[in-house]
Amino acid sequence: MVSFTLRAIGACLVSLPALVTAAPTSHISGDFQVLEQLHEVPQGWVQTGSPAPSSQLKFKLALQQDKAAAFEQHVMDISNPKHENYGKHMTQEEVDAFLQPPAHMTDSVFNWLASEGIPKHSIKADTDWLTFTTTVQKAEKLLNTRFYNFKNTIDNTQVIRTLQYSVAETVAPYVHMIQPTTKFSAPRPELSSVFTSDLEITSSADVDCNVTITPDCIRDLYKMGNTFAKKDPRNRLGISGYLEQYARLDDFSTFIDMFVPSLKGTTFDFKSINGGKNEQNSSLDSVEASLDVDYAIGLSGALSTYYGTAGRGMLIPDLDQPNITNNNNEPYLEQLHYLLGLPDSELPAVLSTSYGENEQSVPKKYTDSACHLFARLGARGVSVIFSSGDTGVGSACQSNDGKKITKFNPIFPAACPFVTSVGGTHQINPEVAIHFSSGGFSERFSRPWYQELDVNHYLQHELEHGKWDGMYNPSGRGFPDVSAQSYKFATRDHGRTIGVSGTSASAPLFAGVVSILNSIRLAHHKPRLGFLNPWLYTIGRSGFTDIVHGGSDGCTGTDQYSHLPTPYVPGASWNATRGWDPVTGLGTPNFETLSKLVLQY
């Protein structure tokens, strides 16, 4: 991706005794049950002392969700064009009613929090999630642990975290997770490459599409003609913004004038989440934001909103990312809860996100919870699209569980079964897989039914027998689902025209295509596409051009982010093959065909 991989810059691991003072201590009476813990402390971190007892920490508590499996099956059903309930998206009220936990569960957790000094009136309840703010002193007593300041020895950033936390046994059956506690992370843009010299072009007429990509190149390659989405509030295109990436209106306006003059005057709205800003005169890096708005909106022409979310996440560091910030807020949860709290009429129809992180760098309870929230967006008719990543088979190529096993690294959220993951290609005539396109198989999520036949075919007939055994999970969710161009996109940023590469070009590109397909459906009185994958792997598959040349790479012996030494795997790669493959998915879009297929159901 020029995607922001919430990438985990690496960190070798040291044993727990190296930081025993950070380990949880049973310091209050009563029985507790450990909810989450880290196996080891990452190298590159030092304990710098204890936070002030009065320091404020904001927590999100996820209640156990006994109806998750039934709900997710319902989302699959309403997204399956062969099912009688296809297209019957749920309202906000229907989702909340379906997932509302039993009153005794919520009451028990409320009472537990109140008994530990957290006033009930300060606890915000949102279906099966609770949000509360408390002091370090109270949090330590509540969670039977000790919080410490940790400093990263690479960039000197600090964070307040613990290695383990517990909850009272009386409420343990009701609490799924509480964060931020053990999730150390810092999202960062994963720039596959940004060409620092200015592009000597002023319009699409100056471009060789084998060298530089513009909207006209994409329209020609994917047979889009001059079709744009109508500006319809039912078909809003949402673009995720994190990490103080500001989408500049002047740059966007110039890009449209240069490359899509038929959309002259088109702009986008901005919505702030958790205090997020969209400063127009900042000197901070904004290539990711510029790329996203230029191509998602420049291709679709849809009514669009840039969602700027403040805060940075926390991670279980691995060889990609020992990079942490002192901000306690996790952007995915902040954004997801904001969006799910919107009335149905204000939800985006398509949400494009060009960010990701190594799946292993995120606690399992967290990936499960976040993926389920993506399913809730799908239930309400939102197509959630993520770039697959820019590390090929992997960059760290080592487990971070203390065992240091050499393996490929799947990407989250790209490997969540309820998002559509977009890989990367380059060149035209023929279009081929690009080497950095991330793909593979989840170690957290099992393979969903909609891709069972395709992935099994790849494993049994296209992948050399025994190749890469032990390096990946052959029963995991395969990604990406589809792919699109990802190399040297002409982009306006800070008043310059530059070239940018990454699957974070592929994601907004594909989001623009989906937005136009939604517009076609709405014009024919059909519902929005919503969660795409069951449709893509059934009806939609014939609307994609199979990419059979090229492949990914990775595991080169040097981490591409931290530049630390990593395991070297000679020839590490997934090849583009006939049918689905873990580099390009089902292939690249043929809009001419898709525009007809989209009206069949």
UniProtKB/Swiss-Prot annotation:
UniProt keyword list: Calcium, Glycoprotein, Hydrolase, Metal-binding, Protease, Secreted, Serine protease, Signal, Virulence, Zymogen
Subcellular location: Secreted, Extracellular space
Gene3D superfamilies: Peptidase S8/S53 domain
Secreted listed as a keyword: yes
Residues of the Peptidase S53 domain: 212-601
Co-factor requirement: Ca(2+)
Cross-referenced Pfam families: Peptidase_S8 (PF00082), Pro-kuma_activ (PF09286)
Catalytic residues of the enzyme: 288, 292, 504
Catalytic activity annotation: Release of an N-terminal tripeptide from a polypeptide
Protein residues bound to Ca(2+): 546-547, 579, 581
GO biological process assignments: proteolysis
Propeptide: 23-202
Glycosylated position list: 210, 281, 323, 575
Function of the protein: Secreted tripeptidyl-peptidase which degrades proteins at acidic pHs and is involved in virulence.
Name of the featured protein: Tripeptidyl-peptidase SED4
Species assigned in the record: Arthroderma otae (strain ATCC MYA-4605 / CBS 113480) (Microsporum canis)
